Design a protein with these regions (language model features):
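Binding-site signature for planar aromatic cofactors or substrates
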Residues: 1-142
Length: 142
């Protein structure tokens, strides 16, 4: 089915759904991110899509400003599929979850990977530094 067929079948998006899309973080989205202890990050290298779960105690994603968030990448299975995808294609999509909350928050943006010691230090957990930090500039928030 193409877009016209789908729109004819489903109709237009509701005004409320269309209006909630923002280009940067607002106070509600910042609060949601700060309360989240789990997210899934989607990346694409031009050929393959990867969905990477990320979790730590709430507040593990640092909101630096309305147009910069940082996510520590801690050692795990070392597949680093998402990081490899970001190195080829900066576009990422995140969905944040909060336990027992039915609402989610989605953030799309452009990502870079940092191993700057000053950036890593902000993400220290129990004296352990992450290997890298994913820095995201949101382009769409809803």
């Amino acid at each position: 089915m193409d877009e016209i067929q789908l729109r004819n079948l489903y109709g237009p998006a509701t005004e409320k759904a269309s209006a909630k899309i923002m280009k940067s973080l607002d106070p509600h989205s910042v609060s949601f991110i700060n309360a989240s202890n789990f997210l899934v990050m989607g990346t694409f290298d031009g050929e393959d899509i990867d969905l990477s779960p990320k979790g730590d105690p709430k507040g593990f994603v640092k909101v630096i400003s309305d147009d910069r968030i940082e996510i520590a990448d801690r050692p795990g299975n070392n597949r680093i599929d998402g990081l490899l995808n970001i190195s080829k294609n900066a576009t990422v999509s995140l969905i944040f979850f909060i336990p027992k909350v039915t609402e989610t928050l989605r953030v799309q943006g452009k990502a870079t990977i940092s191993n700057d010691p000053k950036v890593l230090e902000k993400h220290k957990l129990k004296s352990n530094l992450p290997k890298t930090v994913i820095v995201i500039k949101p382009t769409k928030v809803f």
